[in-house]
């Protein structure tokens, strides 16, 4: 699939334009059937996607900030699909596409609740997209996050579910390969062609491994 019209756009400028689709949208368009048409729709849509929000940012705060770029018809908060609590993103629907582009140009990377928010074009909101798609109900990006983030739920996935014995992430320790494998040959008579089981050699590659169950902070 060719996205030349979005990669090039025949714009000769000394700096990058701000009213263009993100690399994420272009990658998605290449991988998804009908993605190019969806990308074109996002250029004329009055809807924007806002990400990297604090879980504690309110709809009123969003309205106050984004209404500086135009008349807002609706704000749809992103929710954890199990808890129905905010999970760090939203959709904002303006009255015109020009207002949506203005928000993209002038409000991207604005700091809101001490977080640098991200804004992207959106082809249009559909019911169901307000819910997180992660395994635990929130956003996938939070489930991949390793560091503590107080404004986005702390350690979103419990530490013990990501490291230590659960995911076999800790260091491995090999048991003593000679422990409990001493062979006593005194007093035993071996018949020719029938080696005794106790005389079998220990294969170091088959030695049982002991997982290091140490988890930081515990």
From Swiss-Prot:
It is found in: Nucleus. One of its GO terms (molecular function) is RNA cap binding. Residues 176-200 are annotated as: Disordered. Keywords: mRNA processing, mRNA splicing, mRNA transport, Nucleus, Ribosome biogenesis, RNA-binding, rRNA processing, Transport. The keyword Zinc does not apply. Component of the nuclear cap-binding complex (CBC). Belongs to the RRM NCBP2 family. This is Nuclear cap-binding protein subunit 2. It comes from Eremothecium gossypii (strain ATCC 10895 / CBS 109.51 / FGSC 9923 / NRRL Y-1056). The lineage of its organism: Eukaryota, Fungi, Dikarya, Ascomycota, Saccharomycotina.
